Amino acid sequence: MANRFILNETSYHGAGAIRSIADEVRMRKLTKAFVCSDPDLLRFQVTQKVTAVLEEAGLAYEMYSDIKPNPTIENVQNGVKAFRDSGADYIIAIGGGSSMDTAKAVGIIIANPEHEDVRSLEGAVVTANPSVPIIAVPTTAGTAAEVTINYVITDVEKNRKFVCVDPHDIPVVAVVDPEMMASMPKGLTAATGMDALTHAIEGYITAGAWELSDMFHLKAIEIIARSLRGAVANTPEGREGMALGQYVAGMGFSNVGLGIVHSMAHPLGALYDTPHGVANAIILPTVMEYNAPATGEKYRDIAAAMGVKGTESMTQEEYRRAAVEAVRQLAADVGIPKDLRDIVKKEDIPFLAQSAYDDACRPGNPRETSVEDIAALYTSLL
C-alpha cells in the first residue's frame, strides 16, 4: 500500500519570518489579501504585525474577524460572503486553530461553490479544486493547522464538532515566527503546547503510523518535552522550541491521523466550549493507559523522548508507566487540571461517548474501542 505525505509548498521558520510574506505575495502575483484573524489578536495588536508588513510593501488587504474560539458554521458562512464582497484573491490566516480552520473552510467553499454548506464537506470529501491560496501565520504553538490537511467546525444546533479532511485545504505558505507567539498568556501556552504533544503521541501510535511519520512524531515529542516548560515561562528558547515542535508534529499527524484523545476532546469543545488543548491535556494520560496494550514497544520510545532515563533496561510495564507519568507530570508542571470534574456533567456522558465514537479521529485509535469503553474513560476522569 502506498503512503501519502502532503506538506506546505513553502514554509518559513524563525524570528522575523513574517517579513518574508511580501516577497511571497509578489512572487505569486497575488493582489489583495483577505486577512482572517480573531478579535483578541486585533485588540492586542498581534494581527497588526502582519498587516504592517503588507502596508509597508503597498499590498492591499481587507480584515475579517468574525471568528469564535471554536469556529461555527455561521462564522464560515459570514466569511464566505465577506470574501466575495472584498475582491480578494488570497487569504492570510493569522491566529490559532480557529482562524486557520475558518480560513480553510472559506477558501475551499470559494473554490468549490457546490459545497456552499460547509456540512457537506464533513469527512474526507473529494473536492474538485484547491482552496484559494492561503498564507498561514500561527500565533499559538499547538494546533499546527498551518501544515495540516484538516479543519474542524462546530455545529451549534446539534452540539457537535465535525472534521473535514481535504488535501486541497493545506496552506500554500506557512510562516512560523516565534515572535508572533510571544504574547500568548501562560494558560494558552500550556494548553496549546499540550495539544501539540497530543498530536505527536497520538500520531506516533495511530493505526496509520509508518516509518516517515514516526520520525516526525518522535522528534516532536522530544522538542516539546524539553521546550514547553520554558515556553510557559516565556523564555525565547522555549518559544522557539515550541514553534518548531508543534509544526513537526503537524507534519506527521496530518498525514496519518490521530485517535480517541481527540475524539473525546471534540465533544467537550462543542458542548461546553472547553478549550481544545485543555481537553486533550486532561484526557491524554488516561487514554495512554487504556491504549498501552495495543502499542507494542512504542511507549519505550515515547518515554525516552520525554526525557526518561534508563528506558532501555525497563520492562514493558515499567516503560509504559514511565511514559504515562512523564506526560502527566509535564501537564501538572504547566498548570493543566487533573480531571474533568469542573467541565463534564455526568448525565451528558452517554451523548459525549456516542459523539466521540462517531468522530472522524476514532478509527485511527490503536486499540479497538466501543461507546461503552469511551463512556468509562469519561467517567474515570470525573
Regions found by a protein language model. Give the residues of each.
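Carboxylate- and glycine-rich phosphate/diphosphate-binding segment that chelates Mg2+/Mn2+
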Residues: 150-256
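Catalytic phosphate/nucleotide-handling subdomain of diverse soluble enzymes
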Residues: 267-306
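C-terminal charged capping/lid subdomain of soluble metabolic enzymes
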Residues: 299, 309-382
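Short glycine/serine/threonine-rich phosphate/pyrophosphate-binding segments
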Residues: 18-21, 43-46, 73-76, 99-103, ...
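An N-terminal, well-structured beta->alpha segment
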Residues: 1-64
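Glycine/threonine-rich beta-strand-loop-alpha-helix active-site module
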Residues: 74-179
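N-terminal small/polar loop signature for handling phosphorylated ligands or for N-terminal nucleophile
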Residues: 42-115, 229-239
